[in-house]
Amino acid sequence: MLLGSLTLPAQEYKELWLVGTAVPGGAQQLQKVSDGDYKYAGTLQVGELRVATTRKAGKLTQYLAPMLPDANVVNRGLAWKLTADASSPAWQVVVADDHYRLHVYPSQQQLCGEIVQPWGELFVGGGATASGWKEGKMQLMKRDIDNPYLWTWEGELKRHEGIEEPASFKFQGQDRWYPKALHPYAQDTDILKDTRLRTGGPDTKWTLSADGIYRITIDQFNETVKAVLVK
């Protein structure tokens, strides 16, 4: 039987689960959004949770246990160790909320968590827009009346020759380039071919495979984007 801390590369985690009193129904699976990123977006109750490699505890279950005692699940990046000890420290949830978002990064052995607040504004800007890379001139998206995390925009995106990165663009939480932004996971991702968003991090940009009128919908909480080429 394996005890103590272990190390496994990220690709060997077939599944990761949240289990414990803080988790609705006792267990919720994390979504694998990339090889090095597992995510949960949803409700957490006051209590504790563990990040486990199986839904139910068994002989092969391992836990991503915080290195610090009483570690709050809301943090900017706390280290964990892999262990088979079911009595190892758990992550603490001290406030109940429907908009928790947790990211587990196996390669960094870190867990980040937050209660996501809706942004006040969201913009489209970049070389593929009519205003280019100018701050103060970005295209404002429209917030959904019923869901403050949902944003839509419809307009022309096309390659503008003669400027830097003529077919690239980004989504910004203000009419300037910092601090808030939503990025694709990889540089030059076709907006029509990937629905994943990443909040903050490296300055990767979206690109176009075709000029035209686009309808774009962003879910800030779930970190997803859907783009349709209207014409």
Located regions from the model:
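Short, exposed beta-strand-loop hairpins at the edges of beta-sheets
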Residues: R101-P106, W206-V225
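Extracellular jelly-roll beta-sandwich "head" domains, especially the C-terminal globular C1q domain
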Residues: D190, G201, D219-V230
